[in-house]
């Protein structure tokens, strides 16, 4: 859905019909700004005072300048609206935290990955053998669904869909009282 929304945004951005609509609106605005209501006293003063006549060319230049200023302000406000809509349209990423207690909980975790949600998995409530099986199942599913599984703690893993980038620093996990028993290497015991 995110790809479809992005494509629709790109198409709507380059759509020529919308651009002409905005230009028509911009051309109408200076006309509204230039009109002023005159009170009866102002109307009476006009015949008494000689008006300064501005050559038609200067009037045309002034209207062009005003139109250009309106178009610039419109384009600035449009770019601000586009930036704001891009920020609002960006989907918020939800991270689900799961503490699986049995092997069957792995299916629920994979379903979250299918729905493009990030999952933080903590195996602290599982026995080592069950945790290995569960981790193996989740790792296989993440490969099929083009997800990413990263170890973030001694018993914690972060499962993310393909569109989420995780920038994690390499930290030395303490191997003092807990040996890294939950690892991809299934042969080590």
Curated annotation (Swiss-Prot):
Record keywords: Cytoplasm included? Answer: yes
For region Disordered, the annotated ranges are 18-64
Q: Domain of life, per the record?
A: Bacteria
Query: Entry's Pfam families?
Result: SepF
List where Basic and acidic residues composition bias occurs.
Answer: 22-35
> Where is it found, in Gene Ontology cellular component terms?
cytoplasm
Which Gene Ontology BP annotations are present? division septum assembly; FtsZ-dependent cytokinesis
- Keywords per UniProt: Cell cycle, Cell division, Cytoplasm, Septation
The UniProt subunit note reads as follows: Homodimer. Interacts with FtsZ.
The record's annotation in PANTHER family points to: CELL DIVISION PROTEIN SEPF (PTHR35798:SF1)
Q: Relate the protein's function as given in its record.
A: Cell division protein that is part of the divisome complex and is recruited early to the Z-ring. Probably stimulates Z-ring formation, perhaps through the cross-linking of FtsZ protofilaments. Its function overlaps with FtsA.
Record's protein name: Cell division protein SepF
Q: What are the top taxonomic ranks of the organism?
A: Bacteria, Bacillati, Bacillota, Bacilli, Lactobacillales
State which gene encodes it: sepF
């Amino acid at each position: 859905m995110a790809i479809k929304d992005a494509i629709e945004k790109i198409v709507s951005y380059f759509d020529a019909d919308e651009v002409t609509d905005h230009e028509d609106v911009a051309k109408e605005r200076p006309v509204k700004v230039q009109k002023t209501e005159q009170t009866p006293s102002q109307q009476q003063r006009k015949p008494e005072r000689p008006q300064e006549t501005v050559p038609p060319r200067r009037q045309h230049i002034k209207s062009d300048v005003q139109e250009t200023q309106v178009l610039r302000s419109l384009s600035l406000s449009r770019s601000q609206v586009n930036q704001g809509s891009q920020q609002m349209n960006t989907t918020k990423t939800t991270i689900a935290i799961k503490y699986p207690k049995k092997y069957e909980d792995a299916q629920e975790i994979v379903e979250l990955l299918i729905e493009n949600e990030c999952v933080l998995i903590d195996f602290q409530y599982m026995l080592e053998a069950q945790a290995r099986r569960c981790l193996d199942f989740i790792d296989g599913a993440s490969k099929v669904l083009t997800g990413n599984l990263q170890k973030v703690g001694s018993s914690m893993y972060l499962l993310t869909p393909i569109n989420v980038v995780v920038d994690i620093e390499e930290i030395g996990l303490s191997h003092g009282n807990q040996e890294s028993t939950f690892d991809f290497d299934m042969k080590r015991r």
